[in-house]
Amino acid sequence: MKNKSSMELSIRYGILFAIGVISIVCRLIATTDSHLIPGLGSMYYPLQVRCLLERGTLGYSDVPLVFWIEALAARIIILVSSMPVSDSIVFACRLVNAIVPSLIVIPVFYLTLSVSKSKIHPAYLAVILALSVLNPSVLVLFAIDFDKNAISMLFVYMTLYYLWQFSNNRKTKELVMVAGSVMLTLLTHFGCFSSLFIFLLVFTSVTGIFSISRIIKWFRESGIRIVFVAFSLLALILLPFLLKLYDNQRFLHLISYFSDPLQIFRNSFFMLICQGNLSWDWQNLLYLIIINSFSIMSIILFFRIRKRMGKEQSIFYLSLVIWFVLLSNPFINTAIYNRLLFISLIPLTVITIFIFQYCRKPVRIPIAIVLALLLTLTVATSGVRRTYISKEEYLELSSLRTVIPNPSSTIVLAQHRLEFWTSWTLRIKSGQLAGIKPYEYPKYSQVLYVVQKSNQFQEEIPKNASLIHTGKYFDLYRIY
């Protein structure tokens, strides 16, 4: 019996290791054939890291944790290798974005074992772990452009694991770990923190409704618990104000929803689709249908399996279902919906753990097969991703510095995402056209505007702009 138990444990850890390695390899393959980093806004990360290493501050206002991690990795690579500094920074960003998000499998692994009491079948375990890191959000969308999104999902899963442990064991140290994981999420990505904040509110409300007597009894056992929990709740409420220190613009955007909460339903995704004002390609439409189908299914399954669960399990699962429905709700603002839809794979992954634990085989097996096929398709089609600019464009963009007088007191404006490449290659202050007002122009000796000719979606060139340089791939205009 002992040998059998050891073998089962070895198989589970083998699956954990294998899925983690597959995730790292797939994420590395996405960037392996690129002279820099593929994706539209991917140069944002090396640029921020370079600013940290050279000046000790970020070049653009943002929550800092990911850039701190990447800067530390870059510093180590610079010290132990002969690679040029720029190459070391780019390599560090690639490495961090490949390895850290793949660590998601660890909290998901232990959460799965805890929910299933270490009795889950290896095949189901493999599907759950694969769903956590090989899904379209983490593997495709967040593989190259969105380091912060992918890494913050790791901290969200950590929060869910420790919250699950606390809801079952009521140990204060687990509540401390919840608080720490929430803080890490906030310092990594505002969107994921906002989504996690919603879940914590839902979980607190559901727990208060269905388990108030047990909570009161737990508090009576130790007076210090009341103080600690009150302090934790106060800290959670005040956490969003920490965002103001790093990104005042996002903080003001968050506050606007408290003054006008109904704006979240304006220009909803569902309404724009019905009016024919929004078009999606078939892949995104299929993704939407799959997510919302699972959302509806999770509600139905709750009423079928809740009697097989204890009170804590039922509360946690119901909170996940409500969270999942809120994140995948097509009746909210389209811009918000597009972001939340991809984060909704977090509750889907954890809900799947409960489905495999409490549903019967006729339900478990088809779901496992469907998920396995979808994940296989995702991995098979992930592949190598292209950069925002070609090698030839990169070389020409770099050469523009020779035609810019007084670069230290010049700002070069560009279309969104191109400004990061401009600042990286020219080592010059850069921004978006809409981000600099005309009354701010006198701060600089000159204000330039660079146009990438291959971009199919060009902004309108300012009427007062004069062409000062034209090349094969870029035109340079003077605005002021």
Protein language model features and the residues they cover:
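Start-transfer (signal-anchor) and selected internal transmembrane alpha helices
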Residues: M1-I29, R225-A230, I369, Y480
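Membrane-interface helix-loop-helix junctions at transmembrane boundaries of multi-pass membrane enzymes
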Residues: S5-I11, K119-I120, N169-T172, S211-V227, ...
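Membrane-embedded helix bundles of polyisoprenyl
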Residues: I19-I24, P46, V66, C93-V115, ...
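Transmembrane catalytic cores of multi-pass membrane glycosyltransferases
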Residues: S23, R27-T31, D62-V63, D147-K148, ...
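Short hydrophobic/aromatic helix or loop-helix immediately within or flanking a transmembrane segment
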Residues: L58-S86, T185
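Hydrophobic/aromatic-rich transmembrane helices and adjacent perimembrane loops
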Residues: N149, S194, I332-K361
